[in-house]
A protein has these predicted regions:
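Extended amphipathic alpha-helical segments with heptad-repeat/coiled-coil character used for oligomerization
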Residues: 260, 271, 275-307, 313
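C-terminal catalytic subdomain
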Residues: 302, 306-345, 376-384, 392
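Flexible, small-/acidic-enriched active-site or ligand-binding loops
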Residues: 134-160
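A short core secondary-structure module
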Residues: 91-137
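C-terminal helix-coil-helix/basic helical segment that borders enzyme active sites and/or dimer interfaces
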Residues: 235-270, 286, 359-372, 376, ...
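A glycine-rich, basic-preceded beta-loop-alpha segment at the flavin cofactor/substrate interface
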Residues: 132, 156-184, 201-218, 331, ...
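C-terminal amphipathic alpha-helical interaction region
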Residues: 340-441, 454
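Internal helix-loop-helix
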Residues: 1-52, 104-105, 305, 312, ...
Length: 455
């Protein structure tokens, strides 16, 4: 929740924050490195000095995986790692030579880097400043001129014999760094949900204070439909992001079932939530009319930020195929995820029918790769609907199931069916509504959402 709040205020800080905290699980595979760096990485202060580690009060950690010829196919990387002494191995020093096409937050003190060691692709920890105070052979070539997220620098880097230490086992670099990637994917989901919440806050606030044709915009039926639809998408994204975050915490505490849920739910949530963000931002901007197209409103920046989380840490197709890999490696993981969905079984007939159709689609393995996006989309919708049925007011769950599961809605935002209580849904999301996301905000039903996602 705190990450989402921060991301609404300034999205550019999300990347270095996410990478820094996500690096901790990967570093723990090499205990001596974790002992050196973890206290600095989790320190709450910011020390922006380019200084040797022992002089720092805190540190940031980035990662450098992507190369121009490989992109998401990191096994095609050509950066070479040569051991300085003997055969090398975990914790040993290496010289790294090569390039990295995308390296965000290049001011970081430490980077996790993938490079080809003699035994295969391996993970390395590369410090910007060496223990003797000299700069490592980590050379910035230029900063990327990006569509959005411009307050977070992204660079191209060349390594000319840069010194680094191996993290984890040789030849198992992807396995070592994948835990970091999983955590940054969670933050992509949180970031996308945060962007939707910001868009809703701006649109609802504007519509509540702007009058046209004799009435406030928020009181006009068609605008109410648009706003309610945006609110539904935002709330669905938030509850899914929070449920996934809970699974990460439970898995870290040793809950095997939570770990299996997390493995499949992460690419599902990353794909679906992040895919919805750009269209959501565009519609929220349009709610402000011409004023939304002006930089001073903040909406153009939100619009430019919106596609990024879908690209970072593996684009849409990468996530869909990763979900298929998770299904193939652990078929029981699907049962765990559907058990979560099934906690709402018998409450909402449209959800029950949707799940039956989903099971039928999953039963056709011959064409599933071509249908991967569709399957993952439907898994995401099923999870969102189940969470809303269990934790949100009936007005929200009913509108979501009608428009997303039952086909009683159009392809654009603002096409909710007749009978939806748009006013109640919008009021629930109005900035300054202290009731937040509690069920009591719009309903007399019992229970509250696990997390005050209204933040």
């Amino acid at each position: 929740a705190l990450f989402m709040t921060s991301a609404q205020a300034e999205a550019g800080t999300g990347c270095p924050l996410s990478m820094t905290y996500s690096a901790v699980p990967a570093l723990r595979t090499q205990p001596e490195l974790a002992a050196e760096w973890e206290p600095l990485l989790v320190a709450p202060a910011y020390d922006g000095r380019l200084a040797v580690r022992d002089e720092k009060s805190s540190a940031l950690c980035g990662m450098a995986m992507t190369e121009k010829q490989g992109g998401s196919d990191v096994r095609a990387n050509t950066t070479v790692a040569r051991p300085l002494e003997g055969a090398g191995g975990p914790g040993a020093e290496y010289e790294l030579t090569g390039h990295k096409w995308f390296c965000s937050a290049p001011m970081c003190d430490l980077f996790l880097v993938l490079a080809q060691a003699p035994q295969g692709l391996s993970c390395f920890a590369l410090a910007r400043i060496l223990p003797d105070g000299s700069r490592n052979a980590f050379h910035l070539q230029r900063l990327k001129d990006k569509l959005g997220n411009r307050s977070n620098a992204s660079s191209e880097v060349e390594l000319h014999g840069a010194l680094a230490r191996m993290v984890g086992e040789p030849g198992r670099g992807v396995t070592t760094i994948i835990e970091m990637v999983a955590h940054t994917r969670l933050d992509c989901v949180l970031g996308a949900a945060a962007g939707m919440r910001l868009g809703v806050a701006q649109a609802v606030h504007h519509a509540g204070h702007r009058s046209a044709f004799g009435a406030r915009l928020v009181d006009q039926p068609l605008m109410g439909n648009v706003l309610a639809d945006l609110c539904l998408e935002s709330e669905a994204a938030t509850v899914l992001a929070m449920r996934l975050a809970r699974a990460f915490d439970e898995a870290a505490a040793g809950d095997e079932r939570a770990a299996r849920f997390r493995r499949l739910a992460t690419p599902v949530a990353k794909y679906w939530t992040c895919k919805r963000a750009p269209a959501h931002a565009a519609e929220a901007l349009e709610c402000l009319g011409g004023n939304g197209y002006v930089e001073a409103s903040g909406m153009p920046r939100l619009y430019r930020e919106a596609p990024l989380n879908s690209i970072w840490e593996g684009s849409g197709s990468v996530q869909a195929l990763d979900a298929l890999r998770a299904l193939a490696r652990d078929p029981g993981g699907l049962d765990v995820l559907l058990d979560e969905v099934g906690e709402a079984a018998g409450v909402e007939p449209r959800l029950d029918a949707f799940v039956r159709g989903l099971r039928a689609e999953l039963g056709d393995p011959d064409t599933i790769e071509a249908r991967a996006r569709r399957v993952v989309e439907r898994l995401g919708l099923a999870l969102q609907a189940s969470l809303l049925v269990r934790h949100s007011p009936p007005a929200v769950a009913d509108a979501f199931c009608a428009s997303r599961l039952d086909g009683d809605g159009g392809l654009a935002f603002g096409t909710l069916p007749a009978g939806v209580d748009a006013g109640a849904i919008v009021e629930r999301h109005r900035p300054g509504n202290d009731a937040g996301y509690s069920r009591e905000a719009t309903s007399s039903g019992g229970g509250e959402l696990d997390v005050d996602a209204g933040a």
